């Protein structure tokens, strides 16, 4: 301490001495410098002196702080905090380093395990390759005897190996001794060899079509029995949870994977449903490109109606149908598929034998049996809810998107519902039997009417026209198609007027002309669906390919596109249901109706002639004689026309025509016909008008003239209708004759009164 103080004192003395020297020097300089320079030097010295003082003061304060105990404690605490922070950072670093080392160790172990597995797989693969080479070359160590005693079979599921962009399926094979095969002479030995041959085949789709496995398997049992047995064994059979069986093939009979599907497909040897793949290729199908823009919706619907008329009529020859559907999906496995569901298995087999291998529109038709019995499951539900418009899955939907059949045919089958009553009657008139299960649901009154109708229809003569045209006449109970609504407006207007007129007459006098069964659906399906008298097309069915030239009259005696006098094959082939002969003929019924009409006409004409003068009476007698001659000629013409129409119209048209005739009979009773049915010439027409012109001007004569005009219009309209509706029912005619016995007596009295003396 003393030495330090001495040093400080020495420094002070030196500084003081230095200051004195500098002061003296400054004075000397000041003496030499000017006033301004002196002032600057003084200021500089003062600033320097101030800085020195401040520095000295700071040094003293620092010494004081160092000597202060509180300050020393604060500095010590700061140092300790820094030490703790450095220690914590070091521990964190060591912990993270240890975790990283552990992770790297785990990763290294995994890589080693993968490498070991890869080496093991390569080693096993090499062993298998060596075994295959040894088997192929026959140079196995065990010799020929050992090779003949052992074989390699698959064990467990195959292993999937991913090598770059390749996927390799490796099957584990185990070497086992071969089973001893007992050689037996005959067919059993071939079956045993066949079982050994197919043992190594893939089991994903064991029954592809056309294979020998399918042929042998079909001989064992039917497909329905197999499905029932499998459905009992598998809990979720036919659903998405069932990974063994293809649900789409079970529901629709088609799968987009085809034979490459990993799930089992069932191919029955016989079934009630036939499938013709890609048969329809007309407009209306969903296309991948823009081909669909070339046709409008109306043109597509018209083309499908033509296809439906041709194909549906051909399939209906072989038996009653439950459903007829054509797919309009865009997927290849469903595009243009035609499904035909028969009610009986015999009809389906007959259709298969007749249609398979034939040509339609230049393309060979291939029929398949499919197990489709629930159409509600096969058809897309969302597509049905949208009324056959669209689906959220679009054209790639794996369920059926079907066309709407003309007239709404088979819409009830889409929901697995029974057919309506009118359809049962229609099928009864076609095939001679009815579905008793559906007829039980009818009421007792309608049931009696239907039974009486069936008894009458059962005696109809078989049709002699081609079934392809004859079926359209049987479709009287269906609603008009789009083509008849669009291209045959006149026919539609006339039928609409007749329906309105009959409805008004029924409202005024319902006792004389009641409806047949009073059902709404019968009223909806009263008119013709197809206008066959205005549109005739040739069928596109043929027995040979387009290049084969064959006449169109008869093709192998199986099917003819044109009409023939001998009838079609359906009448010769039959459906197993024979009809009884009729108790009466249509010509006799027609004569009775004409006689009734003549009596009414004579009564009305003589009633008007009684009101005239004697000259008018003579003229009326002359007109009556002319009218009698015209009536005879008219009866002859109607009889001849009936004989021709009996060969043109089928028996199924009679039931519907009788309902039309019922309204015509009521028209004849309510309106007195004062004019004859036909005139011999224009001169007779003028004479009758002149005779009516000179009658008395009383109100009764005016009313009679009005009634005459109305009856003329009704008779003209009925005559126009009778050209197409010539058949009458015997029981309807008998009822009309027996309804009012007093009326016949009045007619006889009028004849006796006005008979010339």
Curated annotation (Swiss-Prot):
Compositionally biased region (Polar residues): 444-455
Keywords, in A-Z order: DNA-binding, Metal-binding, Repeat, RNA-binding, Zinc, Zinc-finger
Zn finger (C3H1-type) location: 240-268, 374-404
A GO CC annotation given for this chain: U2AF complex
Positions of the UniProt region annotated as Disordered: 1-127, 441-757
Domain (RRM) ranges: 295-372
Compositional bias per record (Basic and acidic residues), positions renumbered to this chain: 13-35, 51-127, 487-546, 610-634, 644-672, 681-721
Bias (Basic residues) ranges: 36-50, 547-557, 600-609, 722-733
A biological process from GO: mRNA splicing, via spliceosome
GO molecular function, a single term: zinc ion binding
Source species, domain of life: Eukaryota
SMART domains in the cross-refs: RRM_1, ZnF_C3H1
Protein name (record): Zinc finger CCCH domain-containing protein 5
The organism of origin for this protein: Arabidopsis thaliana (Mouse-ear cress)
């Amino acid at each position: 301490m003393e030495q330090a103080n001495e040093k400080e004192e020495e420094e002070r003395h030196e500084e003081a001495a230095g200051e004195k020297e500098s002061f003296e020097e400054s004075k000397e300089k000041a003496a030499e410098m000017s006033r301004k320079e002196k002032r600057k030097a003084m200021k500089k010295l003062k600033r320097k002196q101030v800085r020195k003082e401040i520095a000295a003061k700071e040094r003293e304060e620092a010494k004081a702080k160092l000597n202060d105990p509180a300050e020393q404690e604060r500095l010590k605490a700061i140092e300790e905090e820094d030490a703790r922070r450095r220690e914590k950072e070091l521990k964190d670093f060591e912990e993270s380093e240890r975790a990283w080392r552990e992770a790297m160790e785990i990763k290294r172990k995994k890589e080693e395990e993968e490498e070991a597995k890869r080496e093991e797989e390569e080693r096993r693969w090499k062993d298998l390759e060596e075994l295959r080479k040894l088997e192929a070359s026959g140079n196995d160590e065990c010799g020929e005897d050992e090779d003949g005693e052992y074989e390699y079979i698959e064990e467990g599921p195959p292993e999937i190996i991913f090598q770059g962009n390749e996927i390799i399926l490796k099957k584990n094979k185990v070497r086992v001794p071969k089973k001893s095969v007992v050689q037996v002479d005959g067919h059993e030995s071939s079956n045993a060899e066949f079982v050994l041959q197919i043992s190594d085949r893939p089991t994903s789709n064991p029954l592809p079509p056309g294979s020998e496995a399918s042929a042998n398997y079909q001989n064992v049992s039917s497909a329905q029995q197999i499905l029932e047995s499998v459905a009992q064994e598998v809990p979720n059979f036919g659903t998405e949870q069932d990974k063994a069986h293809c649900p789409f093939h079970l529901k629709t009979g088609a799968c987009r994977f085809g034979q490459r599907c990993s799930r089992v497909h069932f191919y029955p040897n016989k079934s009630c449903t036939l499938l013709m793949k890609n048969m329809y290729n007309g407009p209306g199908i969903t296309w991948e490109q823009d081909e669909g823009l070339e046709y409008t919706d109306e043109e597509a619907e018209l083309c499908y109606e033509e296809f439906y008329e041709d194909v549906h009529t051909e399939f209906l020859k072989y038996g009653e149908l439950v459903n007829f559907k054509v797919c309009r999906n865009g997927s290849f496995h469903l595009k243009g598929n035609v499904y035909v569901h028969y009610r009986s298995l015999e009809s389906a087999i007959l259709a298969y034998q007749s249609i398979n291998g034939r040509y339609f529109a230049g393309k060979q038709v291939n029929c398949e049996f499919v197990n489709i019995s629930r159409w509600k499951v096969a058809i897309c539900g969302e597509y049905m809810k949208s009324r056959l418009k669209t689906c959220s899955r679009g054209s790639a939907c794996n369920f059926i998107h079907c066309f709407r059949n003309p007239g709404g045919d088979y819409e009830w089958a889409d929901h697995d519902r029974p057919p309506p009553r009118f359809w049962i009657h229609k099928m009864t008139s076609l095939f001679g039997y009815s579905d008793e299960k559906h007829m039980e649901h009818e009421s007792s009154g309608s049931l009696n009417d239907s039974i009486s109708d069936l008894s009458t229809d059962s005696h109809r003569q078989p049709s002699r026209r081609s079934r392809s045209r004859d079926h359209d006449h049987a479709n009287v109970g269906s609603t008009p198609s789009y083509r008849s609504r669009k291209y045959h407006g006149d026919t539609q207007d006339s039928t609409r007027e007749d329906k309105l007129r009959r409805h008004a007459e029924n409202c005024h006098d319902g006792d004389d002309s009641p409806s047949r069964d009073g059902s709404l659906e019968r009223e909806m399906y009263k008119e013709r669906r197809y206008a066959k008298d205005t549109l005739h097309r040739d069928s596109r069915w043929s027995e040979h390919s387009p290049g084969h030239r064959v006449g169109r009259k008869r093709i192998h005696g199986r099917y003819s596109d044109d009409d023939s006098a001998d009838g079609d094959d359906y009448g010769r082939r039959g459906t197993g249901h024979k009809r009884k002969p009729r108790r009466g003929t249509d010509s006799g019924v027609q004569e009775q109706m004409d006689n009734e009409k003549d009596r009414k006409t004579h009564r009305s004409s003589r009633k008007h002639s009684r009101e005239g003068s004697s000259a008018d009476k003579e003229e009326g007698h002359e007109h009556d004689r002319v009218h009698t001659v015209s009536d005879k000629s008219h009866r002859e013409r109607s009889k001849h026309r009936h004989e021709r129409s009996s060969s043109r119209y089928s028996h199924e048209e009679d039931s519907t025509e009788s309902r039309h005739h019922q309204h015509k009979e009521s028209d004849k009773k309510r309106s007195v016909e004062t004019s004859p049915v036909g005139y011999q010439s224009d001169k007779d027409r003028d004479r009758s008008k002149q005779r009516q012109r000179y009658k008395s001007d009383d109100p009764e004569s005016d009313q009679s003239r009005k009634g005459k005009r109305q009856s003329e219009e009704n008779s003209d309209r009925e005559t126009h209708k009778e050209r197409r509706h010539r058949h009458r029912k015997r029981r309807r005619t008998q009822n009309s004759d027996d309804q009012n016995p007093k009326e016949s007596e009045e007619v006889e009295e009028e004849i006796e009164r006005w008979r010339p003396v």
